[in-house]
Every structure is written in C-alpha cells, then in structure tokens.
C-alpha cells in the first residue's frame, strides 16, 4: 500500500498535475479533496470531466465517475457485495476505494486517454424501436452507424500510419514539392500548347504522339511479359535440371547397388520416416497446440500492468517451490522401491533424447544437402548462361588453371610494359607542354621587341621563309634518294611485318577473346546502369503516383462527407418546409376542421386553456389565503382538544389499574378513596 501511495504522489507531482504533495500531506487529505484529485485525474484523461465537485451532489459525482470508469473498463476488486461497498466508498470519498483507482489510472494514463477518445465516438446511442419506425430517424441512424464504421477504419489507418514511420513534416514537404512541380509542369504544358498551336496540323501530330506513347507503353508491357516468360523458362529449366540430376543419381545408385543394399536403405528410410511421423511430429504438434492455447488465453485476458506481472511471477515461483517439495517427498517415500525403475527410466529418457537429437541432425543435414544441390545447379546455370560452356571438372579444371596462370604471367608483363610506356608518354607530354609555354613566352617577347623597333612581323616572315626552305630541301632530298634504297626498305619492312604477324598471331587471338569478354562486361555494366536508372525512375514515379492516389482518396472522402452532410441538411430543411406548407394550407383553408388541425390553432387553444386554468388556480389561491388564518386556529383548537382527550384517557387508565386500588388520589382539590 505504501508503494502504491508513493507512486500516486510521484505521478501527481509531475506534469500535468503539479500538485506538490508529499506522503504526509497526501495522506491527510479529506474525502472531498480526494474526490477532487480523482476528478482532476479523470479530467486529464477525458476533458469533459473538468468540473468542480462542490457544484454537484455526491450522487451525481459518483454516477459520473462510475460511468467513465465503466467506459475505461476498470474492474473493482471483489464480487457483487464489494461492488456496492465500492459505490458507497466512492460517494463518501473513502481512501481504500480511491487509492487503487488513482493507482490504476495513473499507471495507464496514455492508454486510457486513447480509450476515452474512442469511446466518445464508438459508444452507440440506443434509439427506441418505436422511434425507428420513422423513415427520417431510421435513415439518420443508419448514416450514424455507417459513419461509426468509417471512423473505425480511419482510426485504424491513422494508427498504422503513425507506426509506419512517416512524419507529417516530411509528408508536408513532399506535398509542397509536388505542388511546386505540378505548377511547373502546368506552366510547361501551357507553353508547349502555345508553341504547338502555331504549327500546322498540330492536332494530327498530337494524335500521332499519343499513338506513339500508347505503342511505347505496349512495347514496355510486352518487354515485361517477355522478361517474365524468360524467368519462368529459367525456373522450368532449373526444375528440369534438378529432376535430371535426381534421375541421374538414382540411376547411378541403382547401377552400382545390389538389391540387399537397396532394401536396407529403404528400410532405414522407412524407419526414419515412421519415427518422424509417429513420435517426433506428434510431440511437436502437441507442444505447438499447447503453446497456441496458452497464447490465445493470454490474448483473451485483459491487459496486465507491471504489478500484475510481478504478482503472477511470485505465484509461479510459489507453485514451483511446492511442486519441488512434493517431488522430493515422493522420491524420499518411493526411493527404496523404485530404484531400478528410476534407473531404467533415466536410461530410456537419455536414449530417447539422443534419438531425437540424431533425428534432428539428420533432418538438418538433408536440408543442407538439398540447399547445396540447389546452389550448385544455380551456379552451373549462371556459368552456362555467361559463356555457354559447361563447368569444368577434375583434370580439365587443373589444365585450365595452369593455362590461366601462364596467361596471367604474360598479361602481367604486358601490363608492366604498357605502364612504362604510359609513364614515358606522360613525361614527354609534360616536357612538350613546358616547351610550348616557353616558346609562347619567347614569341610574345619577340613581338614586343619588334613593335618597339618598328619591324613587327619580321620573325613571322623569317619563320615562313625557313619553313619553305626546309620543305624545299626535304623535297630535294626525297628526289635524290635512289630506287635501290626504296626497294631495300620495302623488303625490310615486308620481312618485319611478316615476323611481327607471326609473333603476334596468338596474342591477337587471345586479345580478340579478351576484347569480346571486355565488351560483354561493358555491355553488362551499361545494361545494369540503365536498369538501375530505369528502376529508380519507376520507383520515384510509383511513389509519386501513390502519394497522388492517397491525396485524391482523402479529397474523395472529404467530398463524400460534405455530400452526406448536405444531404442531411437538405432532408431536414425539406421536413421543415413540408411542415410549414402544411401549416399554411391549414391556416389559409376555409374548412374549420382543417383549421383545427393547424398547429397555430392547437397552440392558441392550449394557451386559452392554460390561461383559464391559471385564473381558476389564482382564485383558489385567493380563497385559501383568506381561509388560512381561521383554519389554522381551528387546527390548533383541534390539537388542544386531542391533547385534553389524551390526558383524560391517561387519567382514566391510571384509575382503572389495580395498583391504584386502596390509594388516595387527590385531583382538583378533592380527596377520594378508590376501593
């Protein structure tokens, strides 16, 4: 109880109550103050409960709190008699009643807020059946039930969206970005429309463009179907290969094996399968059923808090301790008799456990073998699709590895030579750049000097003359060469070309294969990038379209709610208009019978009747006031007379009693002797 009070005080001192209590001040609160604290906690859960209990009677306060606690599904401890004491304690503000309620409410405040909010919309209003005979009331009640179901669906969807990780800020940013993009697209469309309208036959061109778009979509759809059919064919080929491998393995086993070994293997499989079916699977099924039964039982029970769980854990520990004690007593009582039986039982349980472990290990090994076989078939299919060859095995694979190693060494050498050439080329390119820069600076300096001296263009003309003379000398040299030199050179070149061709023939052949593979890898990379970009674009388009669909659905729901609301208002106005027209017809009608049916006539008749009744009552009141004084005197006289008669009766009874015989009674100044 002290922990309960401490938790209540700590919770009341926090937000949003800020009561600033301690254990002593909280324990010293009176009944009215405790009820006000309870009402404040209930008002935090349901704002409708925010009232001052001093303005209510205790019965009204208790009724209001009990109704809200019933909605929140609070279960008071005890049976029906305890329920009556609970109600009485709630009326008078009893601490043993209010403390558990406060503890329960403060433990589950967030959950109870949600429950109170939902109860405001989901508690159905009970309409009497006689009122439902009216069509308007029945239609309104039906719309009310439909709106309640729609609220349930929307609330469920809202909770799913809250738990899905979408934030409202991100959604708003996305909506604003989409609106901006929509405006930009609309502007672009308008500009394109204006630009297209000036072109001749633009309608025909638009029609052709529309047909082109439809055909492209159809082409994409057909490509998608083709890809799906390829996937189906690939899966079918995989299944065929798997079945062929199984058939091959079975044929191989049948070719090598004898009938005795086959029968032995089949007997082992039958034993294993019968054990799995008769012993292992029924036990697992029974355990799963028990677990399912326990889970269903837990789900059907109301939600429990931390204190309830601690209480259940303590009960479970106590029961386990009692079970252990009983087992120890039984073992002590039956130990000399059942010594051998317990030994046999232990051995049987050990053997059964080993059997179960081996069965599980065998099952796991079979599953692992099947998965490895599937993986091998997938890898073989991938290699066959990549280069169209079968997977190498044994000596072929070794020869392929040795050949690949020799080629890799040659490739490394060639790669090293290419790297050296690249480095030399970079060095020469850098020196060329430096020389060009230096030449430009010298040319610039030379031009400035020529401009200063007044002979601009001299260096250019001199360079041209030198170039022309050099060309002329080269031409002269070329003319001076003899035909013998040319023939020798041709022979040398031909011999060199033939040698190089013979030396480079295997390299060119290997290079051609490598180039084909490189082209395939490049095409694969290009296709992969195209696929990734296309997938990203389609994903973004899909997300945009989903957001647009969600927004349009929300708009549709809003428009539907507006439509239902306007229909209700129209029906109400039609009913009022019908009543007003009926009233006007009855009021304007010359028939007195119709006029009597009019509401105005009925109200005027009721008013006159009430006025006459008021006059009669005022006259009666006046008569009562006039006769009030005499009647009060008369009533007083009657009461005095009753007292006098009662006194005489008492005196007479005293005279008649036997105790008064022989006594002298003096009354009214006279002496009497009663015999």
Curated annotation (Swiss-Prot):
It is found in: Cell projection, Cilium; Cytoplasm; Cytoplasm, Cytoskeleton, Cilium basal body. One of its GO terms (molecular function) is tubulin binding. Residues 2-121 are annotated as: CH (calponin-homology)-like region. The modification N-acetylserine is found at residue 2. Keywords: Acetylation, Cell projection, Cilium, Cilium biogenesis/degradation, Coiled coil, Cytoplasm, Cytoskeleton, Differentiation, Phosphoprotein, Spermatogenesis. It comes from the Eukaryota. Residues 132-258, 306-389, 433-453, 509-627 form a coiled coil. GO terms for cellular component: centriole; centrosome; ciliary basal body; cilium; cytoplasm; intraciliary transport particle B; sperm midpiece; sperm principal piece. The modification Phosphothreonine is found at residue 61. GO terms for biological process: cilium assembly; intraciliary transport; intraciliary transport involved in cilium assembly; regulation of smoothened signaling pathway; sperm flagellum assembly; spermatogenesis. Signal peptide: none annotated. Transmembrane segments: none annotated. The CH (calponin-homology)-like region shows high similarity to a CH (calponin-homology) domain and mediates binding to the globular domain of tubulin. Belongs to the IFT81 family. Component of the IFT complex B, at least composed of IFT20, IFT22, IFT25, IFT27, IFT46, IFT52, TRAF3IP1/IFT54, IFT57, IFT74, IFT80, IFT81, and IFT88. Interacts with IFT74; the interaction is direct: within the IFT complex B, IFT74 and IFT81 mediate the transport of tubulin within the cilium. Interacts with tubulin; the interaction is direct. Interacts with IFT57 and IFT70B. Interacts with RABL2/RABL2A; binding is equal in the presence of GTP or GDP. Interacts with IFT88. Interacts (via the IFT74/IFT81 heterodimer) with RABL2B. Interacts with CFAP61. PANTHER family: INTRAFLAGELLAR TRANSPORT PROTEIN 81 HOMOLOG. Component of the intraflagellar transport (IFT) complex B: together with IFT74, forms a tubulin-binding module that specifically mediates transport of tubulin within the cilium. Binds tubulin via its CH (calponin-homology)-like region. Required for ciliogenesis. Required for proper regulation of SHH signaling. Plays an important role during spermatogenesis by modulating the assembly and elongation of the sperm flagella. This is Intraflagellar transport protein 81 homolog. It comes from Rattus norvegicus.
């Amino acid at each position: 109880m002290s922990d309960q009070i401490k938790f209540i005080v700590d919770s009341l001192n926090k937000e949003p109550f800020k009561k600033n209590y301690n254990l002593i001040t909280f324990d010293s609160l009176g009944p009215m103050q405790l009820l006000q604290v309870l009402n404040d906690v209930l008002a935090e859960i349901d704002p409708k409960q925010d009232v001052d209990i001093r303005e209510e009677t205790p019965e009204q306060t208790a009724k209001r709190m009990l109704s809200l606690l019933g909605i929140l599904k609070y279960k008071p401890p005890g049976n029906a008699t305890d329920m009556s004491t609970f109600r009485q304690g709630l009326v008078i503000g009893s601490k043993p009643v209010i403390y558990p309620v406060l503890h329960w409410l403060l433990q589950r405040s967030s959950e109870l807020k949600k429950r109170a909010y939902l109860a405001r919309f989901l508690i159905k209003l009970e309409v009497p059946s006689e009122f439902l005979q009216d069509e308007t009331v029945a239609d309104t009640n039906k719309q009310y039930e439909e709106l309640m179901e729609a609220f349930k669906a929307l609330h469920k969807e809202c909770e799913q969206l809250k738990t899905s990780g979408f934030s409202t800020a991100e959604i708003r940013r996305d909506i604003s970005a989409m609106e901006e993009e929509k405006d930009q697209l609309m502007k672009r469309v308008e500009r394109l429309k204006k630009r297209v309208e000036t072109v001749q036959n633009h309608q025909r061109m638009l029609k052709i463009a529309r047909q082109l778009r439809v055909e492209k979509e159809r082409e994409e759809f057909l490509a998608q179907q083709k890809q799906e059919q390829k996937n189906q064919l690939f899966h079918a080929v995989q299944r065929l290969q798997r079945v062929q491998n199984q058939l091959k393995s079975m044929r191989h086993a049948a070719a090598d094996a004898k009938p005795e070994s086959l029968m032995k293997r089949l007997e082992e499989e039958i034993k294993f399968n019968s054990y799995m079916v008769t012993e292992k699977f029924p036990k697992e099924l029974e355990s799963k059923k028990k677990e399912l039964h326990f889970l269903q039982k837990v789900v059907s029970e109301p939600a429990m808090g931390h204190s309830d769980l601690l209480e259940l854990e303590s009960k479970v520990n106590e029961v386990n301790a009692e079970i252990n004690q009983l087992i120890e007593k039984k073992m002590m009582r039956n130990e000399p008799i059942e010594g051998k039986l317990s030994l046999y039982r232990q051995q049987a349980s050990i053997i059964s456990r080993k059997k179960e472990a081996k069965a599980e290990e065998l099952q796991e090994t079979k599953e692992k073998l099947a998965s490895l076989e599937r993986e091998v078939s997938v890898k073989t299919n991938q290699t066959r699709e990549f280069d169209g060859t079968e997977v190498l095995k044994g000596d072929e694979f070794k020869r392929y590895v040795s050949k690949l190693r020799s080629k890799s060494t040659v490739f490394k050498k060639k790669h090293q030579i290419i790297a050296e050439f690249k480095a030399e080329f970079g060095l020469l390119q850098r020196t060329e750049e430096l020389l060009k820069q230096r030449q430009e600076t010298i040319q610039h300096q030379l031009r400035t000097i020529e401009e200063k001296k007044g002979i601009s263009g001299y260096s250019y003309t001199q360079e041209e003359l030198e170039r022309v003379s050099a060309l002329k000398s080269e031409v002269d040299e070329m003319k001076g060469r003899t035909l013998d030199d040319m023939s020798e050179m041709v022979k040398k070149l031909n011999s060199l070309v033939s040698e190089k061709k013979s030396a480079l023939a295997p390299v060119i052949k290997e290079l051609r294969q490598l180039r084909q593979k490189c082209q395939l890898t490049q095409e694969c990379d290009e296709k992969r990038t195209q696929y990734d970009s296309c997938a990203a674009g389609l994903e973004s388009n899909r997300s945009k379209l989903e957001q647009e669909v969600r927004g349009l659905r929300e708009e549709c729901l809003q428009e539907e709610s507006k439509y239902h609301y306007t229909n209700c208002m129209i029906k109400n106005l039609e009913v009022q208009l019908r009543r007003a027209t009926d009233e006007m017809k009855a009021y304007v009608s010359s028939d007195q019978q119709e006029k009597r049916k009019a509401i105005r006539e009925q109200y005027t008749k009721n008013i006159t009747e009430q006025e006459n009744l008021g006059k009669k009552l005022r006259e009666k009141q006046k008569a009562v006031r006039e006769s009030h004084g005499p009647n009060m005197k008369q009533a007083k006289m009657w009461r005095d007379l009753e007292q006098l008669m009662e006194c005489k009766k008492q005196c007479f009874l005293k005279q008649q009693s036997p105790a008064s015989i022989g006594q002298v009674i003096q009354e009214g100044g006279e002496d009497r002797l009663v015999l």
